[in-house]
Amino acid sequence: MKIVRYIALFGILSGLAVACTPSTSVIPNDAIRLNQLGYYPNQEKIAVVDSGKVEEFVIWDAVSGEQVFVGKSLYTAKSAWSDKTRTTLDFSAVTTPGKYILKVNGASVTFLIKDSVLSPLADAALKSFYYQRTAMPIEEQYAGQWHRMAGHPDNHVLIHPSAASPDRPAGTIVSSSKGWYDAGDYNKYIVNSGYSIGLMQSIYQLFLDYFSRQKINIPESNNHTPDLLDEMQFNLDWMLTMQDPEDGGVYHKLTTPFFEGFVKPVDCKQQRYVVQKSVTAALDFAAVMAQSSRLFASYEEDYPGFSKRALLAAEKAYAWAEKHPEAYYNQNLLNQKYQPAIATGEYGDTHADDEFFWAASELYFSTGKEIYREEAIKKAPQIYTAPGWGNTFALGIFAWLQPGRELNEADRRFADSLKTELLKYADKVIEGAEQTPFHAPYGNDAKDFFWGCLAEKCMNQGVSLMYAYLQTGKDVYLTNAYRNMDYILGRNATGFCYVTGLGTKSPKHPHHRLSASDDIEDPIPGFLVGGPNPGQQDGAFYPTASPDESYVDTEDSYASNEVAINWNAALVALASSLDALAVYSVK
């Protein structure tokens, strides 16, 4: 990365009108890339200009018209793959809440400085799960123009031949209602559901005060339970129906044989099935049910008996997984043996040590049983990796590193070893971030861009850095977590705020059947799209092959413009954490 440094000059001007240096090169307004939602007063404030010919910039108060700041460019950096040179501007010295205008080289853009600036994002990201609910009408009083009729009651689901057992032979009718649509499609998947809830509930435990005050206008908002847990409960109820009551195994997914077209849920016609039980489904189920048993114990008034039921289900699922440690879900093999063939999302995984570690850890903290502690230590990771549905080691680590958790001496030593690996990861991630084209840990390697990268790499990297901050109190980790958030909100190569319904330039045509079929021009808000993907597996027309610009805002681009619950779980996790840390102390 070629870096040309300039001496930074910052000054607050008191009543003086200082003229801007004549433009070196006139640029369009959209060449200025910044966080389109705004900044907290004491947050680092960075903008990037899509030009290498910038020297001076000015900040004006948009209300009074007064010039409040003038600065020199911080540095220029050249992209490793697109050959573009960009300039970084730092205006962190501006801290007074208000609306401002940044002017540079003939271009200008407005931005906000305000308290709780990420609250609308955190709320919208969590509210997206309400829009994904199945089997119930999405009502106008909660959804506004995006209200719709109920679809997929799932009270007439068939046991697929791959899932048949003596007590439930193929063709048996079961009821498996509620739950969330997984992504742009209309199916429901245990692996992704378990991971998504596990990540969000891990964050919930860090900021109890924050989540107790959050209201997102869902049907349960007036009960005694925080809205986040209410929303999780809607999917947890469905997950419980996916457990075979006889042996404790968990069906991998509830699905149609093929993806439905872009039609309203109420117009879908395909028969739905539960398919093969899998070890990863059982363990993700066990982990999240054990975790939920602790969290919902305080809310018996709203959800009587759930905590006990969840823990019993968790232990039963874990026992099944121990008996079937190699029961991996392989859709190709399944289709060679059974009909109808299944062609929907696979969520295949041929390694279950991470799921065993996470499930055993959660069960240990929920039951105190030594056997689960021993299993967790036996399956513990040697290095830290950011969380993802295909690698849940981090969720187990988060359980061990929960602030305020009382651990005995041996457990503390084990937790400290996990903390060491987390910090090694965090230090590597932030190395050199302040010299990159977009002044962020994410986005500086072509390998950062792939299917779902904005959540699975950018957001989950940010979540990991936030945990590193909580473990150490070192601001450098938190600053870099904010930088990754700035990236998805506009400080990036395309200039998109990658969350629907937010910012000044956001996706209008996500690969999302609910949005595409509702006859409403604007997409349902609050969804993080997958992001730039040079793999371009969908065959859509992309304007460039450059890794960080390989994005197209079209409905057919499932490789770059789809939405998914696990991606939004990552958005909920980081947006809520950063907002909570700016407002509330950790409880």
From Swiss-Prot:
Gene ablation phenotype (knockout): No visible phenotype. No effect on growth.
Assigned keywords, A-Z: Carbohydrate metabolism, Cell outer membrane, Glycosidase, Hydrolase, Lipoprotein, Membrane, Palmitate, Polysaccharide degradation, Signal
Leading EC class: hydrolase
Pathway connected to this protein: Glucan metabolism; xyloglucan degradation
Residues with lipidation of kind S-diacylglycerol cysteine: 20
InterPro entries reported in the protein's UniProt record: 6-hairpin_glycosidase_sf, 6hp_glycosidase-like_sf, Cellulase_Ig-like, Glyco_hydro_9, Glyco_hydro_9_Asp/Glu_AS, Glyco_hydro_9_His_AS, Ig-like_fold, Ig_E-set
Gene Ontology cellular component annotations, sorted alphabetically: cell outer membrane
Predominant location: membrane
E.C. designation(s): 3.2.1.151
Catalyses which reaction(s): xyloglucan + H2O = xyloglucan oligosaccharides
Signal peptide coordinates: 1-19
GO MF entries: cellulase activity; xyloglucan-specific endo-beta-1,4-glucanase activity
Topology with respect to the bilayer: Lipid-anchor
A GO biological-process term: symbiotic process benefiting host
SUPFAM superfamilies according to UniProt: E set domains, Six-hairpin glycosidases
Active site positions: 185 (nucleophile), 511, 553, 562 (proton donor)
Cited function: Catalyzes endohydrolysis of 1,4-beta-D-glucosidic linkages in xyloglucan with retention of the beta-configuration of the glycosyl residues in xyloglucan degradation. Cleaves the backbone of the 3 major types of natural xyloglucans (seed galactoxyloglucan from tamarind kernel, dicot fucogalactoxyloglucan from lettuce leaves, and solanaceous arabinogalactoxyloglucan from tomato fruit), to produce xyloglucan oligosaccharides. May be superfluous in xyloglucan degradation compared to BoGH5A (AC A7LXT7), the other Xyloglucan-specific endo-beta-1,4-glucanase.
PANTHER family (UniProt xref): ENDO-1,4-BETA-GLUCANASE
Further comment found in the protein's record: Gut bacteria supply the human body with energy from dietary polysaccharides through glycosidases that are absent in the human genome. Xyloglucans are a ubiquitous family of highly branched plant cell wall polysaccharides present in the vegetables we consume. Enzymes involved in xyloglucan degradation mediate the conversion of otherwise indigestible plant polysaccharides to short-chain fatty acids.
Protein name: Xyloglucan-specific endo-beta-1,4-glucanase BoGH9A
Gene source species: Bacteroides ovatus (strain ATCC 8483 / DSM 1896 / JCM 5824 / BCRC 10623 / CCUG 4943 / NCTC 11153)
